[in-house]
């Protein structure tokens, strides 16, 4: 194994191994620096180069091992995946083409025109023929005078109001006007 260790090339100064992380002016690169410090560095450097040579050899052996023992290309059996349809054909939409295509929204006139062009029957359901169940949310109550959201109801006339000014206005109304407001809301008049 000693015969296979690669020879590490040195730079112009013999016996000094340069570490690429250190600057050239550092004392470890200087052969004439203090006493045994430089010699011990040289020994450590040569030991590390020896270890590098072994690791390089091991790496080269590891690279060659799979090629020697390989029995050729290994083909896996083409097993169909249960979630993929083998008869699926792409429609051409999607992928890189989909990002480039400009998608525009249809306006209301275009939607209505396309719905009119469809062959509707008289008994087909539409938004007006569907009987929806009553909502679970409580119905919003609006003022009979101003149309704003009304949190209050006058107990005498049963008209709804939202502010104090509306309440004072409702109290001064004659009974026929109160009946007219209630008729607009389709509420029965309780006031005789």
From Swiss-Prot:
GO terms for cellular component: cytosol; fibrillar center; Ino80 complex; MLL1 complex; nucleoplasm. It is found in: Nucleus. Pfam families: YL1_C. One of its GO terms (biological process) is regulation of chromosome organization. The keyword Nucleus applies. It comes from the Eukaryota. SMART domains: YL1_C. Keywords: DNA damage, DNA recombination, DNA repair, Nucleus, Transcription, Transcription regulation. The keyword Membrane does not apply. Residues 1-44 are annotated as: Disordered. PANTHER family: INO80 COMPLEX SUBUNIT C. Proposed core component of the chromatin remodeling INO80 complex which is involved in transcriptional regulation, DNA replication and probably DNA repair. Component of the chromatin remodeling INO80 complex; specifically part of a complex module associated with the helicase ATP-binding and the helicase C-terminal domain of INO80. Component of some MLL1/MLL complex, at least composed of the core components KMT2A/MLL1, ASH2L, HCFC1/HCF1, WDR5 and RBBP5, as well as the facultative components BACC1, CHD8, E2F6, HSP70, INO80C, KANSL1, LAS1L, MAX, MCRS1, MGA, MYST1/MOF, PELP1, PHF20, PRP31, RING2, RUVB1/TIP49A, RUVB2/TIP49B, SENP3, TAF1, TAF4, TAF6, TAF7, TAF9 and TEX10. This is INO80 complex subunit C. It comes from Homo sapiens.
């Amino acid at each position: 194994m000693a015969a296979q260790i690669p020879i590490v090339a040195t730079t112009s100064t013999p016996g000094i191994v340069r570490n690429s992380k250190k600057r050239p002016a550092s004392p470890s690169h200087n052969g004439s620096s203090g006493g045994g410090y430089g010699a011990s560095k040289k020994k450590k450097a040569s030991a590390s180069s020896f270890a590098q040579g072994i690791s390089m050899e091991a790496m080269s052996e590891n690279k060659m091992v799979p090629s020697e023992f390989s029995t050729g290309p290994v083909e896996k059996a083409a097993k169909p995946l249960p979630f993929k349809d083998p008869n699926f054909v792409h429609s051409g939409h999607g992928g890189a083409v989909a990002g480039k295509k400009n998608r525009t929204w249809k306006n209301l006139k275009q939607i209505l025109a396309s719905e009119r062009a469809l062959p509707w029957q008289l008994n087909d359901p539409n938004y007006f023929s569907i009987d929806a169940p009553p909502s679970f949310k409580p119905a919003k109550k609006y003022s009979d005078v101003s149309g704003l959201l009304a949190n209050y109801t006058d107990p005498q006339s049963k008209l709804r109001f939202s502010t104090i000014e509306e309440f004072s206005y409702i109290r001064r109304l004659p009974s026929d006007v109160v009946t007219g407001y209630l008729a607009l809301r389709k509420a029965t008049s309780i006031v005789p």
